[in-house]
Structure formats: C-alpha cells, structure tokens
Amino acid sequence: MRFLLLVLAVALLSGEEGTDSTVWSQYARGGLSHDQGKSGGHGYYRINRKTVTSFRDLRLFGYGLGDDSYIYLRYKSSTKYSENVKLYNFTTASYQKNTRADLAMRYHFNQGFGYFINEYNNGHVTGELGHAYDMSDFLNDTRKTSYLKGGIFWDHELGKISTKLETEWFKQISDVVTTDLSRVQFFAEISYQLNNLLSLIMGFEQDYYTANKQSPQSYYFSLGWQK
C-alpha cells in the first residue's frame, strides 16, 4: 500500500514542466455516510494538477460503518492530443478494501479514449470508452477479470451550486471467473459553496450488477474544504 502511494505521488508530480497555465487544487471532506441500513462517518482528500492539455488527479476516500471499513485510493491521468482537439486518452489505477463485502483487496486498472461531447461556459459533458481490468481477493479467492468500459460524465456549475452526474458501464469479457461481474455504476453529487473555502455536499452512489440484479447503494453528507 505504501509503495502504491509513492508510485501515484510520483505520477502526479511527473509530466510536463510547470507553466503559467498549471493549476493545483486541493479538496478535503468529512461527514456522515449511510450504506445498506448502516450509518457512520467518512473522510476524503483529493489533489489535482491541470494544464491546458493535461489532468492529473489523486483521491483517497475512507469510511467506517460500525465494525466495517472501506478504503478507496484512485489516480487518474488524462491528456488531450492538442489544445483545440476534443479527443483525449486516459489511464486510471485504483485500490479498494471493503471488509463489509469481504473484499480483502481489489486493484483496478482501465485505459482508453475520451471525447468532450459538449463544452460550455458553466461545465462540460464527456464520454469515455476503453478496457478495464480487476484483480480481486475475496477471502483468499483471487479473481482476475477484464471488461469493456464506457462512461458518460457531466459537470455543471451555476453560481454557488455545482453538480456532477456520472454513469459507468463495465461489461465482463473474460471467462476466468464463472460469476458475471458486469455492472453499471451511478453517481450523483450536488454541492453548495458557503464561502471561498467551505461547501456543503450531498451525494449518492449505486452499483447495479446485471447478472444477479443486486444494487447496493450509499448516501453521504459532507462539509467540504477547497484550496
């Protein structure tokens, strides 16, 4: 885990040299979570680096629900082919541990191409298509699975209010495991800016597994900080 953090930190700092257009941002959150009948607390930290053509983003999220805990670490890198081109490539690597789901660990990797479907003054809509790979350990039962991956992402700002809507689709294409882990993931978030640093945030997440029709979902309410 420490080695993975080091690799992701180096990746975040690497790349093209800083220019006048380079923008660094940091975010932190703390609040309440509710997942399948259990309530608890959560914490979140995010740092990203943007230029005209590139985006590097590192996120760390964790929560506790009674005796259960969840940890999620994700790094995403995306690069436009040029400033005026809407097409970009992306790479995502993540680590998860979820004691409630008996998930000892999951390493996830995906890469592919994205396209800015619509860019406007207050936000943008992007679409992505690529290949994804999971390596999971459920109570010492190791599973290696690959998927086709697609997604639609919408970010919008209106005054002090900002919203995010995301839908990602994973279609299992490997037969290494007998269980079909194909799924659709939904995410929605709305935030209200209290001042230059603080905001109130509400969000909803749901996974829908197409084979067994299971659809675990969670809600959260946070106080956020941004610099």
Segments and roles (model prediction):
Residues 43-47, 73-77, 111, 150-152, ...:
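Membrane-embedded beta-strands of outer-membrane beta-barrel proteins
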Residues 51-58, 82-89, 121-125, 157-165, ...:
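Repeated loop/turn-to-beta-strand initiation elements of outer-membrane beta-barrel proteins
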Residues 122-174:
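Detector for outer-membrane/organellar transmembrane beta-barrel domains
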Residues 1-22:
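Cleavable N-terminal export/targeting peptides
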Residues 32-42, 63-71, 97-105, 137-144, ...:
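Solvent-exposed loop/turn segments connecting transmembrane beta-strands
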Residues 216-227:
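Outer-membrane beta-barrel "beta-signal"
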Residues 16-66, 111, 199:
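Outer-membrane beta-barrel initiation region
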Residues 28-34, 58-64, 75-77, 91-95, ...:
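Transmembrane beta-barrel strands of outer-membrane/channel proteins
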